[in-house]
Design a protein with these regions (language model features):
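Aromatic-rich carbohydrate-binding modules that target alpha-glucans
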Residues: 1-23, 29-52, 118-167, 230-280, ...
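Short, aromatic- and glycine-rich surface loops/edge beta-strands on solvent-exposed regions
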Residues: 26-28, 172-192, 281-287
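Extracellular beta-sheet/turn segments enriched in Thr/Pro/Gly and aliphatic residues
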Residues: 49-77, 206-210
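Long, charged/polar, low-complexity intrinsically disordered N-terminal extensions
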Residues: 79-145
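Non-catalytic, glycine-rich low-complexity segments
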Residues: 79-107, 190-236, 309, 313-326, ...
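Aromatic- and glycine-enriched glycan-recognition loops and surfaces
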Residues: 220-221, 266-270, 274-278, 336-338, ...
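Conserved, mostly hydrophobic/aromatic
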Residues: 231, 285, 351, 397
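Glycine-rich phosphate/pyrophosphate-binding loop
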Residues: 302-361
Length: 412
């Protein structure tokens, strides 16, 4: 049979369920001849590689890496495709995993199956023909009571999933376990690997942390002129605050930044207190975290998800104190905010900051499409004033959050 490389990455595979139960040997040959062949250990002209098929109908997958000549073979039940890059299982609480019933072989009772939880802080979990390798593991047990009704009401997408319980000792370690790679494997009564998958953890993270984490204030907040920086990153292994002076070049390298290691709290948040001189400083978080997208621990530089100010094109967050009078328009001090007797008295006009003035030729070109247009006496503002005289009392700005993918430099 031909091994194929459909995605062109240099890894050739072939799978079949047609090999009867028994013991076999194989090797890989190039060009339909034995002139160039590879066997055990990837050695040229190496020994045949032995493997066993435990029963008829088992899927056998052969893999050959062209660059290294490494060869492997694994077996699994028909219909199952162990793949840790997928995430079919859900961690829904520190002691509970949801497994899709559709992934259980037809006609097999879940009581007769066996599951294991695997984890590694550094990643590197892999699947061979027998099990998930690397890291630590714990046995899971099937709970015939199923998933809690309250969970299913909140997450109807989990209907049809079976409940797997995590041992108490492992459950206590779950916040630390979630800082690395996580996988669940399923085996039959003989110990044959049937399936293996990665794990989605968002529901479990909410279950463990959301109540206490919601009591925190995130972003940067000032008290007695001192800023406190806080970010929620429960799966991070380390978080460091990087700061650059106020008004500094947003393109300044990270090597020029001041660094402050942040402290983790039990609710998944990280925080650090800064000095008054950090007012209006540019900053980023350096986050060390396991990334399922790459299968490795990565170091990422990210802006603050709770930013109240950012530099051009969102390259850096800015530590702005919103209570600072310097950011208050002078007119606000002498203009009382109108009060309505009841919300139903509102007459609301919705508008988009950009669309309000982007084509208004009665205001300076550099103000068009921006907040500055509201300070001009253009046709847009004259129209709003006319509406106000007619009874309009509320302006609702459509979403004004920062969109990092939109170019902000007018010159571009």
């Amino acid at each position: 049979p031909w091994l194929q490389d459909p995605d062109g990455d240099g890894t050739f595979t072939w799978s079949t369920a047609s090999i009867p139960a028994g013991n076999y040997e194989f090797k890989v040959a190039h060009g339909l001849s034995w002139a160039e062949n590879y066997g055990a250990g990837g050695a040229r002209d190496g020994a045949n590689i032995g493997f066993s098929v435990p029963s008829d109908g088992v899927v056998v997958t052969f893999t050959y890496v062209l660059a290294t000549h490494q060869i492997s073979v694994k077996t699994s039940k028909a219909g199952a495709t162990p793949d840790l890059t997928k995430a079919k299982a859900f961690l829904v609480a520190r002691d509970l995993v949801a497994w899709p019933a559709a992934a259980i072989p037809a006609g097999v009772q879940p009581e007769l199956l066996h599951w294991r939880l695997h984890w590694s802080r550094t990643g590197g979990l892999a699947v061979d023909e027998e099990t998930v390798t690397g890291g630590s593991l714990a046995d899971l047990w099937y709970d015939p009571a199923g998933l809690p009704s309250a969970l299913l009401a909140a997450h109807p997408e989990l209907a049809g999933y079976v409940a797997l319980r995590v041992p108490p000792k492992t459950a206590q370690q779950m916040p630390a376990i979630l800082k690395g790679q996580l996988a669940v494997a399923m085996y039959d009564v003989t110990g044959l690997l049937l399936d293996a998958t990665g794990v989605q953890s968002a529901i479990g993270l909410d279950s463990m942390f959301s109540r206490s984490a919601a009591q925190r204030r995130y972003g940067v907040h000032f008290s007695d002129r001192k800023p406190t920086f806080r970010v929620w990153a429960p799966t991070a292994q380390k978080v460091t605050l990087l700061t650059w002076p106020a008004g500094s070049d947003p393109a300044a390298p990270s090597s020029a930044a001041s660094r402050r290691v942040m402290t983790a709290a039990d609710d998944g948040s990280w925080s650090v207190e800064g000095a008054p001189l950090l007012k209006n400083a540019r900053y980023l978080y350096e986050v060390v975290v396991y990334a399922p997208s790459t299968g490795k621990v990565e170091t990422n530089l990210v802006t603050d998800p709770a930013s109240v100010a950012l530099t051009l094109d969102s390259t850096r967050s800015v530590a702005v104190d919103l209570a600072d009078a310097a950011f208050m328009p002078a007119q606000w001090r002498s203009t009382a905010s109108p009060a309505l007797r009841s919300a139903v008295d509102s007459t609301i006009y919705e508008l988009h900051v950009r669309d309000f003035s982007v084509n208004d030729t009665t205001i300076p070109a550099e103000h068009r499409g921006s907040y500055l247009a509201f300070a001009d006496d253009g046709v847009g503002m004259r129209h709003l004033k006319a509406l106000a005289r007619a009874g309009l009392n509320t302006v609702h700005l459509l979403p004004t959050f920062d969109i990092a993918s939109i170019e902000e430099d007018p010159a571009k």
